Design a protein with these regions (language model features):
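Long terminal segments
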Residues: 1-3, 43-97
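Generic recognition of long tandem-repeat/solenoid scaffolds
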Residues: 21, 37-39, 53-55
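N-terminal leader/targeting segments and the first structural element of proteins
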Residues: 1-23
């Protein structure tokens, strides 16, 4: 089963396997350290919360070591799940910088 990541509009923008986050095309874009989301370089971005990458306003989250990456098979788009907001800004796009 694919673990999708959605944006505020409800569109699937990525997915995660093990500790890696991928764009829908299979390109690795980030890594997980528990619920904390980091760029591949180790820089903190936000938290995985309710299948979204959001800024929960945590401060002083340390960088983590860069991780070896692999490309994944592109994910099939599950369709829109409906717009959802949990009161935290969606920051998935920061992984694509």
């Amino acid at each position: 089963m694919t673990n999708y990541i959605y944006n505020e509009d409800g569109d699937a923008v990525g997915f995660w396997e093990d500790n890696l986050i991928f764009a829908m095309n299979g390109r690795p874009v980030g890594q997980l350290n528990g619920p904390s989301v980091h760029k591949l370089t180790g820089e903190y971005v936000g938290e995985l919360y309710e299948d979204m990458v959001v800024d929960r306003y945590f401060e002083d989250i340390d960088r983590i070591p860069p991780t070896p990456v692999r490309r994944a098979e592109p994910a099939k788009n599950p369709g829109n799940r409906g717009a959802t907001s949990y009161g935290y800004p969606d920051v998935f796009e920061q992984l694509l910088d």
